[in-house]
Design a protein with these regions (language model features):
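Alpha-helical scaffold segments that mediate packing/assembly in large oligomeric complexes
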Residues: 123-195, 328-332
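Extended amphipathic alpha-helical segments with heptad-repeat/coiled-coil character used for oligomerization
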Residues: 190-211, 215-217
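Feature marks short, highly hydrophobic, charge-poor N-terminal signal-anchor/signal peptide-like helices
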Residues: 1-7
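Single-pass alpha-helical transmembrane signal-anchor segments in small membrane proteins across taxa
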Residues: 7-15
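Hydrophobic alpha-helical segments involved in membrane association or supramolecular assembly
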Residues: 79, 138, 142, 207, ...
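Sequence/fold signature of self-assembling virion shell proteins
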Residues: 21-62, 174-187, 218-332
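Short acidic, glycine/tyrosine-flanked loop/strand segments centered on an H-E-D-like triad
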Residues: 101-128
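N-terminal "assembly arms/tails" that initiate or stabilize quaternary assembly
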Residues: 14, 18-110, 326
Length: 332
């Protein structure tokens, strides 16, 4: 089989530092009577996947990205953290300054194959009034975004730093009226600041939350809608507002837990029927280790050209870099 790689520029994701799709790959080129996907069309749809996926991605724009596996073979990517220096101070004229050794810690992020595909028939391509390939690319784009965002979400929610709605101290005391409010935000900021978690761009912490959670917070008079300050800097994808030095990103990807799930995650003492999880974090909170950027691929000839498979494929992994830089919140 002849494999053709078609590169394209990730122009639609300039606002997401370090994020790019890879190449478009075709399993075979064939000049038979079936409707193949010509190079120009494949290139167009690879760009379409890139564009369509962007609005759904929330976590990727804040991840620390590394692609070392493209140069060094292996199944993991290592992120190196420098430990803080502990010495230093005033000196007398005759004091000898003894250099302090630098020390590091490693965060190992395993990578795995990721992907999904869909299949269309030759008959459908020839007879449908719809743009079948365009529809397929949109479905794949949305699926890729949901998968990637879900992996980031599940990674950061592994943190052991937990707060509860309305200042409650345990899941057992949480009630159906303990919403995500100003007390919740201040509790999270206190923990992050106490842990010396660096702010994003030295300016703010980030919270990614469900729309239900942010509804109550928006009623506070100190809440600032994103459209008020949008001219001062470029907004992040999904950013809806700011409060108390925290910017808020809204997404339905954040978990909505029933009572069984709440008790499974937080213990049998929890009594609320429905719970919502949100996450706060600062700089260098979590990692995205990429061995192969996302590609749009077609599977060539199947059943004499009667079927065509189109899918996305990549190799990556996610992991926590600094757990102290992450706080999760369970609220009603």
């Amino acid at each position: 089989m002849l494999t053709v790689f078609i590169s394209f520029v990730a122009f639609a994701l300039v606002c997401m530092t370090g994020f790019a799709f890879g190449e478009t790959t075709s399993a075979i080129a064939n000049s038979g009577g079936y409707t193949s996907i010509p190079e120009a069309v494949r290139d167009f749809y690879s760009r379409e996947v890139l564009f369509q996926a962007q609005p759904r991605l929330r976590f990727a724009q804040f991840a620390k990205v590394k692609r070392d596996l493209q140069a060094i073979r292996g199944k993991s990517i290592v992120f190196v953290k420098y430990n803080n220096l502990t010495g230093g101070g005033s000196l007398e004229e005759n004091d000898v300054l003894t250099p302090e050794a630098m020390s590091t810690a490693e965060v190992v992020v395993p990578v795995k194959e990721q992907g999904n595909s869909t299949q269309v028939t030759e008959y459908l391509l020839r007879t449908s009034l719809l743009d079948v390939l365009g529809d397929a690319s949109r479905l794949l784009a949305n699926n890729m975004a949901v998968v990637l965002d879900g992996q980031f979400r599940d990674t950061v929610l592994q943190t052991t730093n937990v707060i509860y709605g309305n200042g409650k101290k345990s899941p057992a005391t949480l009630t159906a009226t303990d919403y995500f409010n100003t007390v919740t935000v201040k509790d999270a900021v206190e923990i992050l600041a106490t842990n010396n978690a660096p702010r994003i761009n030295g300016d703010f912490y980030v919270c990614i939350a469900h729309p239900h959670q942010l509804r109550t917070l928006r009623d506070d008079k100190e809440w600032i809608e994103a459209n008020v300050y949008m001219g001062r800097r470029q907004l992040y994808i999904g950013e809806v507002g700011m409060y108390n030095g925290v910017i808020f990103v809204e997404t339905t990807q954040m978990p909505v837990l029933d009572s069984a799930k709440i008790q499974e995650k937080y213990g049998s003492g929890a009594t609320i029927k429905t719970g919502y999880e949100a996450v706060f974090f600062g700089e260098n909170a979590y990692a995205w280790a990429i061995a192969l950027d996302v590609e749009l691929r077609d599977d060539g000839v199947i059943e004499l050209g009667r079927k065509h498979t189109l899918g996305w494929y990549g190799i990556w992994g996610t992991g926590i870099i600094e757990e102290k830089n992450i706080v999760k919140a369970l609220t009603a």
